[in-house]
Design a protein with these regions (language model features):
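Surface-exposed interaction regions enriched in Ser/Thr/Asp/Glu
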Residues: 15, 285, 369-387
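Loop/helix-junction capping segments adjacent to catalytic residues or to phosphate/diphosphate-binding pockets
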Residues: 1, 23, 79-82, 136, ...
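Acidic-residue sensor for enzyme active/binding pockets
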Residues: 3, 103, 258
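Conserved C-terminal alpha-helix-loop-beta "cap" of PLP-dependent enzymes
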Residues: 205-374
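Hydrophobic side chains in beta-strands
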Residues: 73, 144-146, 233-235, 269, ...
Length: 387
């Protein structure tokens, strides 16, 4: 009886979520035993990025899994894509299902004007906010917001199961200082960030060969809205993968951006950046095109590969395993994560069947220099699969 109360009722229960979630969400499934019901997002074939969850997709997932306990929504995704959060909340609540929002990259949504709706304003039940990303606090400091339908004291009990008993007052102080700063100057700060991002998009697009995308992607469904503070740039048309441009910016121009993937780079513009920093980035990208551009033959686009979930993440993670080379693992069930970090979205998760396409994608990402994580083998030459 006790197990069936509140948010604790997750063991062997289902949670509806997009596959392009951060590894921390899937780590939670390993710990609690919940079973994922993936809403496989659309893919922008050119940009190689996963889009948002369409309301019809969520409705079908709820219809097929009426006992699901929660829906998890990225708001926004790493690339700035937003789903129709208000509609998802309304639909889920009508079926007695909680809505959780991953707002790791959405602190500013609570303070900006003309930005996508934030989780709490949309009626979400809980929202995880990484203040250290766009809010200005120290790395590792975050905030968990709860709605009226969630008992904060119960949430505190759950958090205490895994949280350190030796809290860092340095981190707590930085959270409070950042909270105060945003309460007093958040709107003007993020208005300036959005203005710099728009300026950067226009300047980068004028170079040619790059595509810095923004609200022009919005289609009202899989891209319901776009976070204009994000500066995501498609690079394949100059013949370089995003990770290659990322490396050049760091090694040749002393510019450290957020990350590069197979097709794109992401520059995270913060409240501490200045227009001079934007000018340096634009100038470096112009230089890279002039000095390093080449024919794009042989470059792969990023792609979304629908996962086949064979067993639950928890069962796979704790199962007996054996080690196989990536090529020899095709057809087996993965017992571990494989991901490029950042962004930390698993290419492969425990319990998913390894296909030829997944194996080839892992090998290509390694070849291009992506930082690979999640595997027991630090060189990512072998994968742990179910024995």
């Amino acid at each position: 009886a006790q197990e069936s109360r509140g948010l604790g009722d997750v063991y062997k229960r289902q949670i509806i979520l997009p596959r392009n979630v951060h590894k921390s969400a899937l780590n939670a499934l390993v710990l609690c035993g919940a079973v994922p019901v993936y809403v496989n997002p659309e893919m922008n074939a050119k940009l190689g990025i996963s889009l948002g969850m369409e309301i019809d997709q969520v409705a079908r997932a709820i219809e097929d899994n009426p006992d699901a306990k929660a829906v998890l929504v990225n708001n926004p995704t790493y690339y700035g894509i937003c789903s129709d959060l208000r509609a998802i909340v309304k639909l889920a609540h009508s079926r007695g299902i909680k809505v959780l929002t991953d707002e790791a990259h959405g602190t500013h949504l609570y303070f900006g004007e003309n930005l996508p709706v934030c989780g709490m304003a949309a009626g979400a039940d809980m929202s995880a906010i990484s203040m250290h990303k766009s809010g200005g606090s120290l790395t590792q400091s975050s905030i968990l917001l709860t709605g009226k339908a969630v008992k904060a004291d119960h949430v505190r009990q759950i958090i205490n199961l895994t949280q350190t008993t030796s809290a860092s007052y340095l981190l707590l102080s930085s959270l409070d200082i950042s909270r105060r700063n945003l309460a007093l100057r958040g709107r003007e700060s993020f208005a300036r960030v959005a203005k710099m991002a728009e300026y950067a998009r226009n300047e980068i697009n004028s170079i040619g060969g790059y595509y810095a995308y923004g609200r022009d992607l919005v289609n009202g469904t899989s891209i319901y809205d776009y976070d204009v503070t994000k500066l995501s740039v498609y690079t394949l048309d100059i013949g370089l993968a995003g990770i290659e441009v990322y490396d050049l910016l760091r090694d040749e121009y002393d510019i450290q951006i957020e990350f590069g993937d197979i097709c794109n780079i992401l520059a995270y513009i913060s409240i501490g950046d200045r227009i001079q920093d934007i000018e340096r980035l634009v100038g470096a990208l112009q230089d890279i095109k002039r000095l390093y551009s080449r024919d794009r033959t042989g470059l792969l686009s990023g792609e979304y590969i629908n996962p086949e979930v064979a067993v639950s993440p928890q069962k796979a993670f704790y199962a007996e395993k054996k080690s196989l080379s990536i090529k020899d693992s095709v057809g087996c069930i993965s017992g571990e994560f494989v991901m490029c970090y950042p962004p930390g979205i698993p290419i492969l998760a425990p319990g998913e069947r390894i296909t030829k396409e997944i194996a080839e994608y892992i090998l290509y990402a390694k070849e291009k220099g992506c930082s690979m994580q999640g595997t027991e083998d630090p060189a990512v030459e072998y994968l742990q699969v179910l024995a």
